[in-house]
A protein has these predicted regions:
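N-terminal Lys/Arg-rich, disordered targeting/topogenic segments
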Residues: 1-9, 211-213
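Glycan-recognition and processing domains
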Residues: 5-85, 163-187
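Extracellular ligand-binding interfaces
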Residues: 57-58, 62-135
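Short, conserved beta-strand segments of beta-strand-rich sandwich/propeller modules, principally
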Residues: 90, 141-145
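Solvent-exposed strand-loop boundary residues in beta-sheet-rich modules
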Residues: 110-114, 152, 165, 170
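Extracellular beta-strand elements of beta-rich domains used
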Residues: 144, 161-164
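Short beta-strand-plus-loop segments that form exposed binding edges in beta-rich domains
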Residues: 145-155
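Juxtamembrane interface at the cytosolic side of transmembrane helices
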Residues: 195-213
Length: 213
């Protein structure tokens, strides 16, 4: 107890402790995610899988003889149900559009029969040459719905899409990337420990004052 009092009696000890605790939690979380993915690979649940676009259920899309897809309404969808025991971290494909694609997104559900919702969707990262990569959150998945484009009203879009790859090797994190935060995560690691330290400091200043009263 005296050692703790001595430590926290030092100037800047509280925020330093908060940052060290946040760093420790981040490292443990990264190690957990690394272990979880390694186990899924060993069990054969996290594997690279290549599928044709027509392996997905097409809604509002018509397949053509030349392998292209043409939209027939303003809300084209590609649905993959019964994701089951698969662990899907990323989805990637290459697409070219004859027409304005506008918004692209991927919806997911976590329970069978669950409705698709804007709260459960991700947007792609374009890496050039028409390639798009979607990174899914670490959660159980029941179904996926890819919205490959969003045509303007009364307009059609024809798209040429390569095969769709689940968990392409070059889209999954390397060992060290499990411990490197994104820009947003880095911002949170800077902000929240500081806020926590400030809150504890304010509470510590208020509680002794109440006792004296």
């Amino acid at each position: 107890m005296k050692a703790l009092q001595k430590w926290f009696g030092r100037r800047g000890a509280l925020p330093l402790t908060a940052y060290l605790a946040a760093l420790a939690v981040w490292v443990v979380l990264g190690a957990f995610h690394l272990g979880s993915d390694s186990l899924a690979r060993a069990q054969g649940r996290l594997t690279e899988e290549t599928m044709a676009a027509t392996d997905w259920q097409l809604v509002g899309l018509t397949p053509n003889d030349d392998g292209t897809l043409t939209t027939v309404d303003g809300d084209p969808q590609m649905i993959l149900e019964n994701v089951g025991d698969r662990v899907v971290r990323t989805i990637s494909y290459t697409a070219q559009f004859d027409g304005e694609a506008r918004e692209l997104c991927l919806y997911y559900t976590t329970k069978v029969g669950e409705d698709y919702s804007a709260d459960r969707r991700v947007f792609p990262r374009s890496v050039g040459e028409g390639r798009y990569i979607y990174t899914l959150p670490r959660t159980s998945l029941a179904a996926l719905r890819l919205d490959p484009c969003s045509p303007e009203e009364n307009k059609t879009v024809t798209l040429t899409m390569s095969s769709i790859t689940l968990n392409a090797a070059d889209t999954l994190p390397h060992f060290w990337q499990y411990f490197v935060p994104s820009w947003y995560q880095a911002f949170c690691l800077v902000l929240y420990p500081a806020l926590a330290a400030a809150a504890v400091s304010i509470a510590a200043a208020i509680v002794p004052g109440r006792k004296r009263n």
